[in-house]
From Swiss-Prot:
<feature type="active site" description="Proton donor">
    <location>
        <position position="93"/>
    </location>
</feature>
<feature type="binding site">
    <location>
        <position position="118"/>
    </location>
    <ligand>
        <name>5-amino-6-(D-ribitylamino)uracil</name>
    </ligand>
</feature>
<comment type="pathway">
    <text>Cofactor biosynthesis; riboflavin biosynthesis; riboflavin from 2-hydroxy-3-oxobutyl phosphate and 5-amino-6-(D-ribitylamino)uracil: step 1/2.</text>
</comment>
<dbReference type="GO" id="GO:0005829">
    <property type="term" value="C:cytosol"/>
</dbReference>
<feature type="binding site">
    <location>
        <begin position="61"/>
        <end position="63"/>
    </location>
    <ligand>
        <name>5-amino-6-(D-ribitylamino)uracil</name>
    </ligand>
</feature>
<protein>
    <recommendedName>
        <fullName>6,7-dimethyl-8-ribityllumazine synthase</fullName>
        <ecNumber>2.5.1.78</ecNumber>
    </recommendedName>
</protein>
<keyword id="KW-0686">Riboflavin biosynthesis</keyword>
<dbReference type="GO" id="GO:0009349">
    <property type="term" value="C:riboflavin synthase complex"/>
</dbReference>
<feature type="binding site">
    <location>
        <begin position="90"/>
        <end position="91"/>
    </location>
    <ligand>
        <name>(2S)-2-hydroxy-3-oxobutyl phosphate</name>
    </ligand>
</feature>
<dbReference type="InterPro" id="IPR036467">
    <property type="entry name" value="LS/RS_sf"/>
</dbReference>
<feature type="binding site">
    <location>
        <begin position="85"/>
        <end position="87"/>
    </location>
    <ligand>
        <name>5-amino-6-(D-ribitylamino)uracil</name>
    </ligand>
</feature>
<comment type="similarity">
    <text>Belongs to the DMRL synthase family.</text>
</comment>
<dbReference type="GO" id="GO:0009231">
    <property type="term" value="P:riboflavin biosynthetic process"/>
</dbReference>
<dbReference type="InterPro" id="IPR034964">
    <property type="entry name" value="LS"/>
</dbReference>
<dbReference type="InterPro" id="IPR002180">
    <property type="entry name" value="LS/RS"/>
</dbReference>
<dbReference type="GO" id="GO:0000906">
    <property type="term" value="F:6,7-dimethyl-8-ribityllumazine synthase activity"/>
</dbReference>
<dbReference type="Pfam" id="PF00885">
    <property type="entry name" value="DMRL_synthase"/>
</dbReference>
Amino acid sequence: MATIEGTFEKSSSLKVAIVIARFNDLITNKLLSGCLDCLSRHGIDVSESSNQIDVAWVPGSFELPIISQELARTGKYEVLITLGAVIRGDTPHFDVVVSEASKGIATVSRETGVPIIFGVLTTDTMQQALERAGIKNNLGWSYALQALEMGSLMKAVT
């Protein structure tokens, strides 16, 4: 029986794109910071002149799938990370945005064969979002780890 797993040792050569929503940027900027910190500590060049990582900003989480699709189709990236924060309000808008963003991102990943990490916080309150973006822990770090693992796993199976 073969066991195939992603590793973190062989991930320093990965090419990564991060697609990040501007809406709720108090949260998404913190997620980006955690994400870049993790990638850097695992050997990815995150400097301004890096050819290993690109960051694309979109207006909100609803727009994450379309830009993820275009970036994945370029063939330049081995893994994408989407970052967003959707906080429940008094209208059904939350449900629509979360549903379409998650379905769209999953569809793009399946159709292109490029792993896309779903780093969209979906919380009931701003406090919950802040806790997940740095007050208690920074899930941006976790999303980057998932990207490293999936990027190396895809190399192992292809």
